[in-house]
Amino acid sequence: MPNYRRANQAGGSYFFTVVSYRRQPIFCEPAFREALRVAIESTRTRYPFEIDAWVLLPDHLHCIWTLPPNDADFATRWGQIKRRVSLSCGEQFRRDEWLASSKRKHREATIWQRRYWEHLIRDQQDFARHMDYI
């Protein structure tokens, strides 16, 4: 797995954008929403975080999380959430014609783009700007 440069700050607040694979408008499908809700609850049990804001759009989502003190590992949390959703409803949204060899090799579903965008919230003004955006 590549080692991406990430702005990690224990106890920090982060703004995320996560996009569906090929911008499929599946994020508002009832099965997806339920799988996402369950995945978030399950992940938060093992890896706690606060959800400050969340918006779910047809092909992407935005959210703001605050991590616990002494914890900056949002990547594990996103990995858990994406994995659980894929296991729960991946077959329903599977598109075999989209499975390139690299997606087959990594046993990926056709639900998520591989990466996501994150932004470390720097101060209260930055937090307010991102809350307004959501």
What is each of the regions a protein language model found here?
Residues M1-Y133:
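Short catalytic/metal-binding and nucleic-acid-binding patches
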